[in-house]
């Protein structure tokens, strides 16, 4: 039986195939691709995601309309039950096509536009997709967490941050090689987690409870190393 990681990536691959030529023009973001960043042998499984987040280089209504017309030719249609104009559906799969910069319809994640230039290719289920560097992925998640303002113990964005810190072997090195702006943001994130009055709890509640104390200390060490960059 496929696990969460395999199921998430299988759905991402199905979306990539449906996009066809447009697949070369987008970057996959969000929790559906998080297992790509899990380089730790024996990494825990990520959570299942309800939708696929795809970043697109559009910023005007006319560009969004042109994208809508292109997607319709690929049997990808606006979700009639969607809560925002960026949500589409394809054979029961929910897909959010997120603009890479702010539009007249509202803000977007400020790390998507710089992330587009730094995206790299990887292959899943036999098809190539573009994803963000792990440092920028963390920056998008930190901004998303702050914009929603939820308790870190119950936040999917914060859960994803902890998952990457726990399961990516090269995260500190990647942050060290990132831009000064990314480093500044991730240092703020690190300070928040380490200085939180319930620091251990907000980390350990998102990781395997059998090894929570050991892995939690390992994550805190990574955060300290990020602060020293």
Model-based region annotation:
Residues 1-229:
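Compositionally biased terminal segments of proteins
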């Amino acid at each position: 039986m496929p696990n969460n990681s395999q199921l998430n990536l299988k759905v991402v691959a199905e979306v990539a195939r449906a996009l066809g030529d447009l697949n070369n023009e987008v970057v996959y973001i969000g929790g559906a691709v998080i297992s790509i960043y899990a380089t730790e042998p024996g990494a825990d499984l990520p959570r299942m995601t309800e939708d696929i987040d795809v970043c697109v280089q559009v910023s005007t209504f006319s560009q969004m309309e042109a994208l809508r017309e292109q997607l319709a030719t690929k049997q990808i249609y606006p979700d009639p039950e969607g809560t925002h104009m960026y949500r589409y559906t394809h054979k029961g799969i929910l897909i959010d096509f997120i603009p890479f910069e702010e539009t007249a319809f509202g803000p977007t994640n400020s790390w998507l536009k710089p992330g587009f230039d730094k995206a790299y290719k990887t292959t899943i289920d036999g098809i190539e997709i573009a994803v963000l560097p792990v440092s920028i992925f963390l920056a998008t998640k930190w901004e998303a967490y702050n914009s929603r303002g939820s308790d870190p113990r119950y936040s999917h964005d914060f859960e994803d941050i902890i998952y990457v810190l726990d399961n990516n072997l090269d995260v500190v090195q990647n942050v060290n090689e990132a831009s000064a702006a990314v480093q500044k943001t991730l240092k703020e994130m690190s300070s928040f987690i380490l200085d939180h009055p319930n620091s251990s709890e907000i980390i350990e509640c998102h990781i395997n409870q059998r090894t929570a104390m050991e892995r939690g200390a390992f994550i805190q060490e990574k955060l300290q190393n990020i602060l020293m960059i």
